[in-house]
Amino acid sequence: MKPVGCKESRSRQTSVAGARANYRNLVACLNKAWAPMVARAGGRFRAPSVLMFSGTVSSPCGTHSDSGPPFYCTTNDTIYMNLTQDVGNYNNYPEAYNKVWARMWMLHQFAHEYGHHVQNMVGIFPAYARIRYERATYAKELEDSRRLELQASCFSDIFIGSNRRSYPITGQSLFQWRFLIGNTIDPQHDHGAPAIHKYWAQRGWDARNPTACNTFAASSSKVQ
């Protein structure tokens, strides 16, 4: 991926307006970065919609609450960002390093959900949806889910790595990015263990090329 000179918004997610400014900035950057790559892969690029929610939100993909993560809905090409989480992460902790972590968390989460949009545009998500529910065991279904989610994170960090100089991701931002990619939680075992998530996120950052993110060709040990 070629860098597109993406810079972090000057707004902070202290409020609805601040979070919205960040989401708008990120989706514009991601559209610019991914459009040519989707076209080269034979997909039809289309910009996603972005909605933010607090409390509960209904979508064509079901009802979700702000006690859970943001999500992407393939039916309407929409990224749903958890406003309660993003604003709360920034406002609830006074330490400067925690505020940097909150900014990096929002960046990574947004780019991850956009990664699902990329998967949808190039046909990966529809293929996954067909295959997963034909698996003989629930364990295999979960493995397919981890392959999908780990690839979305790898795609996320292709973008972040490509734009690390302009954004910029340096100093405390780099420290917090490294921390968060290796300290994920996966209670349902459908997103990948922390060390595995770090492995794929780092591959995306280093390679900055989707060919490094083929989780569906990886051995089972690489998608635990």
Task: Specify the residue positions occupied by each region the protein language model found.
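Extracytoplasmic/secreted envelope proteins and their assembly/folding machinery
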Residues: R20, R24-N31, A35, A47, ...
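Surface-exposed patches in mature extracellular/periplasmic domains of secreted proteins
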Residues: M37-M52, P126-A129, N163-Q176
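Short pre-active-site segment immediately N-terminal to the catalytic Zn-binding motif
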Residues: Y90-Q109, L142-R146
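Post-HEXXH active-site segment of zinc metalloproteases
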Residues: N120-S145
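Post-HExxH zinc-binding segment in Zn-dependent metallohydrolases
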Residues: A136-R165
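Long, well-structured alpha-helical subdomains associated
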Residues: I160-Q224
